[in-house]
Amino acid sequence: LHLCDRRQRQMCIRDRSKCRIVSYKSTLFFINELYYVGEDIMMKMSNFRWKVAWLIFIVSFVSYMDRVNLSVATPVIMKEYGFDKIDMGLIQSFFFAGYALMQVPGGMMAEKFGHRITGSLAVIWWSVFTALTAVAKGKFSFAAVRFLFGMGEGPIYPAFAIAIFRWFNKKEKGNASSFLLNGSFLGPVIGPALTVVLMSTVGWKMVFLIFGIVGILMAWVWHKYVPENPAESPYVNEAELAHINEGRTDVPIVKKAAPWGKLFTSVQFWAIGVQYFITDYIMFVFLAWLPLYLMEAHGFSLAKMGIWAAMPWLTLIIITFSSGYFCDKAIAKGASQYWIRTLCGSAGIIICSLALYIATRTADPMQNVMWLSLSLGSLGLTFNASWACAINLGGEFAGSISGWMNFWGNIGGVIAPTLTAWIATSYGWDAALIATALSGVVGVLAWFLVRPDKAIV
């Protein structure tokens, strides 16, 4: 064996694909982050980090399945317990209150104790209270259970942000973030139809028990396969570890608290929170009320709603995945992080608001679903830009930055169900959707204060 010369090493750093070429005479591989050439020796990058990305996708999917099942069961629960829209809006808001409350503490927990422990405990906690939703009897017990369920889900996304920071090359963070987001968005795609099928066969209460059991199983998988440091994983070889650590300065795996004094004086810190407040506010209007809206405003049956309510979320998945891929490609080729992330983030909200307004002017049910799909789907541009920016701005403090951002997003979630219910009850569904569309103006303005190319800390 002999060390690569400087030219060979620089070639390998510039074009990682060259390191994967299999040759018996001159095969490049990695040992302790050095590049060697040897005869009859082959090493290919293991790419286990993308299996971790798919696991993040699945856990995110389960988390949103656990949220959307209440929205789908809302008509049945309202009838069984005599609740009205405002009652259900308040119950939904209690979930988001608990969820928002744990965002910043969840980020601090993920940084202090690591994404493995924090993520596992969060999934177990929320799964227990998902199951306990089945035993709630009145609006106060429903509200209490959903509040505690929200507290359990609170730390998971900050934990995922830390995992992405530790497990992925800095040029892959946008694409990795799209796995996190699209797992969340797949829940409302499959959730309505699956929940309707389960409700029709075993009743709405068993739906919550089944999802609770699935969540506990996922907590075990996360704890087993995603250690704090990729170097501790038996599935990550030296080639992949060197790729993950390329251009990275060493940071401790378990670390001290974020510099909150510096963060609170940063305009970017507040701007990324404000734009995400608007982004999540709009999304949670869809999450909380889309099923009932389609049934009341456009006469969809329960079975038909279970199918068509998935279309906006499916569109969101497609746009989020594609935007994450193409934005990362553009940045890797030298495009400005500021323009790529900022333009995508603001354009997503603009298109969303315009399409949502057009949906209110459309009487045909299928055209309405089409415009709603474009509206929610365009937020894929914004979601992807938001999480990539949070990770870039925070670096080793990505858990705290993403927790702060998600905290404001879920303040939007606290307000959206109840405010939308009140407007819809008082003035009709069209007024509720127009008010939602108008909120986008604030989000667009906030985006132009975010500079993803300039880290806060």
Model feature map: region roles:
Residues 145-184:
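Cytoplasmic helix-loop-helix junction between adjacent transmembrane helices
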